[in-house]
Amino acid sequence: MRRYEDKHIPVMPKEVIEHLIWKKDGIYVDCTVGEGGHTLLLASISPDIFVIGLDIDSEVLNIAEKNLSSFTNVKLFKSSYVDLPVVLKALNIEKVSGILIDLGISTYQLKAEGRGFTFNRDEPLDMRMNLEQKKTAYDVVNFYSEKELADIIFKYGEERFSRRIARSIVNSRPINSTLELVEAIRKALPPQEIRKRKRHFATKTFQAIRIEVNGELSNIENFLNNVPDLLEIGGRLAVISFHSLEDRLVKHFIKNSNKLRQIVGPIIPSKEEIDENPRARSAKLRIAERI
């Protein structure tokens, strides 16, 4: 039996089901299938529910296909959530009853060798969600200017030592692996800063580089702009975010939309869930309704 560290556990499953499902014969979309945890829960509610699942990561989608093979009311697509309108058009579906998106990185992506998302072992600098795209973390780390690096580390990582870290990265080039990058970050930070941080000192910089490689924030904006026209009246949007940049984007979009209203959130995981699944500790769930 796999431990929680090795197995992807869906975040806030009860809360997602309680607030997303309002029609037990509706069409629902899981925009980030991962290993299929949330998708399985949605499909299990009723055989009359139809679930469309998307994921841009072909490796993790293969796992989901195996996990969901017994369900006849699920259809999976290798596609980015940004392209949801294209997928629905191909299925001749104009409106759906609910849309779920989990913006966190999957356990598989962290644990699979060679993906470069983790700072806990030595791997090539990759960090691509979509293995078919060309830009990798290696390109960002080795070819961005010092100013460009400082800007993205500050903006996407909310790292106050961004300039020092960018300078250290440039001075350490070429950087070929994750642990070489960790060492460059370590050199830039005061020892007392490293000691006092609750999370690994490289977390913020790795987050920033991953966001840059995958264009995550612009993708979220594009996705959100599409959502209102894809939901039927009364339809629900459920967004699980894992850091303040994502949550602010979602919060402000819903607040400023004349087609959506927030009905629940932000919900955070219970202490019991965090004990079972530490990955959930920084998650926030917001639910909006199409009006």
From Swiss-Prot:
The protein's matches in InterPro entries, at most eight in alphabetical order, are given as: RsmH, SAM-dep_MeTrfase_MraW_recog, SAM-dependent_MTases_sf
What's the protein name? Ribosomal RNA small subunit methyltransferase H
The species this protein was found in: Thermosipho africanus (strain TCF52B)
Give residues annotated as binding S-adenosyl-L-methionine.
G36, G37, H38, D55, A90, D102, Q109
The entry assigns this protein to a family as follows: Belongs to the methyltransferase superfamily. RsmH family.
Its Enzyme Commission number(s) read 2.1.1.199
Q: Which HAMAP family match?
A: 16SrRNA_methyltr_H
Q: Which SUPFAM superfamilies match?
A: Putative methyltransferase TM0872, insert domain, S-adenosyl-L-methionine-dependent methyltransferases
User: Keyword set for this entry?
Assistant: Cytoplasm, Methyltransferase, rRNA processing, S-adenosyl-L-methionine, Transferase
For this UniProt entry, what is the primary localization, expressed as one broad class?
A: cytoplasm
- In terms of superkingdom, the source organism counts as Bacteria
Which major enzyme category is it? transferase
PANTHER family membership: 12S RRNA N4-METHYLCYTIDINE METHYLTRANSFERASE, S-ADENOSYL-METHYLTRANSFERASE MRAW
Reactions that this protein is recorded to catalyse: cytidine(1402) in 16S rRNA + S-adenosyl-L-methionine = N(4)-methylcytidine(1402) in 16S rRNA + S-adenosyl-L-homocysteine + H(+)
One GO BP = rRNA base methylation
Localization of this protein: Cytoplasm
Give the protein's biological function: Specifically methylates the N4 position of cytidine in position 1402 (C1402) of 16S rRNA.
GO terms for MF: rRNA (cytosine-N4-)-methyltransferase activity
Gene Ontology cellular-component annotations: cytoplasm
